[in-house]
């Protein structure tokens, strides 16, 4: 059985709309160059909750909570061509999206 090449792309962002648009761009680019695409697969959202005291001096009972949600997507590109890799490197994505690529 031949060892097939695969590119795994993990996307992270705080805004899910920008994340979905970026994932759609990547999938469209990969399909246009002739590669098979699996995804985007939505991964569980991380939620960080920060509790701070509202008053600067006392009144510890009065607190405020803030949360930060990190949305994640996973895309697998199966059988990528050299044209696929080249076009993915040139792809222009928004600055709010963290991209992790594993070959």
UniProtKB/Swiss-Prot annotation:
PROSITE patterns, alphabetized: RIBOSOMAL_S10
CC annotations in GO: ribonucleoprotein complex; ribosome
Keyword Ribonucleoprotein found: yes
Gene3D superfamilies: Ribosomal protein S10 domain
Keywords, in A-Z order: Ribonucleoprotein, Ribosomal protein
Homology family: Belongs to the universal ribosomal protein uS10 family.
Protein's UniProt name: Small ribosomal subunit protein uS10
Species this chain originates from: Natranaerobius thermophilus (strain ATCC BAA-1301 / DSM 18059 / JW/NM-WN-LF)
